[in-house]
Design a protein with these regions (language model features):
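N-terminal Rossmann NAD(P)H-binding glycine-rich loop of SDR-like oxidoreductase domains
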Residues: 2-25
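NAD(P)H-binding glycine-rich loop region in Rossmannoid oxidoreductase-like domains
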Residues: 3-4, 9, 38, 45-102, ...
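Structured catalytic cores of enzymes that bind and process phosphorylated ligands/cofactors
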Residues: 18, 23, 65, 94-100, ...
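Oxidoreductase cofactor-interface core, primarily capturing Rossmann-like NAD(P)-dependent enzymes
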Residues: 22-27, 42, 118-196
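Conserved Rossmann-fold NAD(P)-dependent oxidoreductase catalytic core, especially the SDR/UDP-sugar
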Residues: 23, 35, 74, 82, ...
C-alpha cells in the first residue's frame, strides 16, 4: 500500500508516520508539508510545498497512491471563523479534490474531532466548520472516506505537540491521560491508535 500523509510534523501526523513506517504492509509514505519531518527512512519520501490551495506544480508526484491520511489541523482558539474555515475547510478540500481526481481508488482518512457538528448548525464555530468539512469530503469520489473523531490523544514514543500550550497540558496531565485511557477508552486514544 502507498500512502500520502499531510501534517506529518504535527502530533497526530507524527504518530501516523511512525506507525506507517513500522507497518510491513505499507510500501511507501509520501509526506507533503511546509517543513521537513526530520526523519530518514527507506519508505519515506517528502515534498515541501507552501501553497495548500494549489497542487498543480506537484500533481504528477501525487498520483498512484492507495490512501491519504489528512492530519493537518489547528486549534480554533483565538481565531475568527473566516480564518479557521480557510485553514480547516478550504485547505482540506483543495487537497482532497486534487487527490480524488488523481487517485479515484484512494481511501481518504480525515482526522477531525469529537464534537464535530455534522448538521453544520450548532453554536460552536469549530464544530460547524469541521462538520461541513466532513460532509463535503464524503461527497468526493473516493473509493472510501473515513472521519476519525478522537477526543483526547495521548502522545507516545517521544511525540510532541507543536503547540506550546497543548504540549504543556500533555506534560502536566501525562499520568492522568494513561488512567483516562484505561477507564474511559471512548474519550481517549493514543498516537499509536490514531494511525493505521
Amino acid at each position: 500500500m502507498k500512502i500520502i500523509l499531510f501534517g506529518a510534523t504535527g502530533m497526530v501526523g507524527q504518530g501516523v508516520l511512525r506507525e506507517c513506517l513500522l507497518d510491513a504492509g505499507i510500501e511507501s509514505v509520501l509526506a507533503v508539508g511546509r517543513s521537513p519531518t526530520g526523519q530518514r527512512h527507506p519508505k519515506l519520501r517528502e515534498i515541501l510545498h507552501d501553497n495548500f490551495m494549489d497542487y498543480s506544480a506537484i500533481e504528477s508526484r501525487l498520483a498512484g497512491y492507495d490512501a491519504c491520511f489528512f492530519c493537518l489541523g489547528v486549534s480554533s482558539v483565538g481565531m475568527n471563523e473566516e480564518r479557521y474555515r480557510h485553514l480547516t475547510y478550504d485547505i482540506t478540500l483543495a487537497a482532497a479534490t486534487t487527490l480524488a481526481r488523481l487517485n479515484p481508488q484512494m481511501v481518504f482518512v480525515y482526522v477531525t474531532g469529537q464534537g464535530t457538528d455534522s448538521s453544520e448548525k450548532g453554536r460552536l464555530m469549530w464544530a460547524r466548520v469541521k462538520g461541513k468539512t466532513e460532509n463535503d469530503l464524503l461527497k468526493l469520489p473516493f473509493k472510501a472516506a473515513y472521519m476519525l473523531r478522537p477526543a483526547a490523544i495521548q502522545p507516545l514514543h517521544g511525540i510532541r505537540s507543536k503547540t506550546a500550550w497543548v504540549q504543556a497540558i500533555y506534560v502536566a496531565a501525562g499520568p492522568l491521560l494513561s488512567l483516562l485511557h484505561r477507564v474511559a477508552p471512548k474519550y481517549m486514544t493514543t498516537t499509536e491508535q490514531a494511525a493505521p
